[in-house]
Amino acid sequence: MTCACVVAIAPLSLPAAQALSETDSVKSTFFRPTTVEGGISVGQVLTMDRYQRAWMESAASRGVHWGWRRRTLFAPDGYAADYNYPEWGVTLQMMDYAGVKMRKTPSPDWGMAVPVDYSSSPGAVFSLVGSFSRPLFRTGKWQMGYALEEGLAFCTRPYAKEHNIDNELTGGHWLIHFGASLYAARRLDKHWSLRGDLAFRHVSNGATYRPNKGLNAVLPTLSLQYDLDETGTPQVNVPKASFVKGAFWRIDASVGVRTLIEDWLRTQYATPPTDAEYRTDHFKRYAVANLQLDRMYRYARRWATGLGADLFYTPYVRTLQNQEVPEGSTAKYSCWSGGIALKHEAYYGDFSAYVHLGMYLWRHTGKMQSFDETPYYERVGVRWTPPRWKGMSVQFGIKAHRLKADFTELGIGFQW
């Protein structure tokens, strides 16, 4: 994300200053620039479907966090004012998921898998995240809005055949973190304030390894904040940089990586205990590629919306065909698939976040397609477009079905 640029401004006249002081933004006491905080979270891990319900024993979670926030005061590029002077933050979160227990009890549903005599757990998850908090309402001693988080997480007890065999939530030590929350904050005195978040947090490996169920939790969070600065006032009369609405084309090419749910199901439930691959924690990764052509319309400084065509190349489908056809599968197989998608992008300076909702026009990935995929797909990610690159950009994202990762990708793009 980009920081606000500091500019000098001429002093306000007394009438203008009086008029300005009547606005909610200037009356707010939440404009001291730098804040440190600490807090606690207590919540529950969500059970997402009937399959997970069959082996979840308990879901209690708790945690602590420490963070630093920088409140945006003013910026001549206009983004700060457009987002109502947001806050940027860096937070270290430590979540204790020892109270989350998983265990498969004897059932014919598990095929050849032999239940074990202990419960599995994700242990603790440490996350280092960047956050963006946008105030929707700010006046006097109160501030309310929404916040988004992205970062990297480390899980102390991922899935392991030897000692954590029923942990299907976290498949590796290193995970991707995403969070979203609604928040309210109240000023207590000159420097202290309280902030409460109703937070949803997700960590997973983005289909880069198995298992890939992901850990989803609702975590009410309370933070005690301390402002390091004496005062700060947004310079709301700073002239904004000019902005011109307009349409543009963009082409993106990306490569991604994924593992196969077919490998997971085969080794978990269709492999005898005497086989070396029985309930293994070693999985092969497969490469995928994608090409996108989009027509977008930038109708506001911070937003663009449009329609795009997506072409996917998934050579792992040939591997599935070679495995499944000899077993009697009559499903269709193709390494190529395509779709169209509605695309929306939110900008702040050189960075943007995107979300796509697409529908396949054709896709044939074998007998597991109806179980593991949907006719529609989602894609979320972040993009960096430095001005000196003359329209070139780099992006990192995840494509998913029903919010479950299909692959994680890295790509380049060009717009004109």
Which residue stretches match the model-derived regions?
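Residues that define the transmembrane beta-barrel architecture of outer-membrane proteins
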Residues: 32, 58-64, 84, 120-128, ...
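Residues on the lipid-exposed face of transmembrane beta-strands in outer-membrane beta-barrel proteins
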Residues: 64-72, 128-136, 148-152, 178-186, ...
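Repeated loop/turn-to-beta-strand initiation elements of outer-membrane beta-barrel proteins
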Residues: 75-77, 140-144, 188-194, 230-233, ...
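Surface-exposed strand-loop-strand hairpins of Gram-negative outer-membrane beta-barrel proteins
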Residues: 44-65, 103-118, 259-290
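Outer-membrane beta-barrel "beta-signal"
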Residues: 216-235, 405-416
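Transmembrane beta-strands of outer-membrane beta-barrel proteins
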Residues: 34-38, 86-90, 144-150, 178, ...
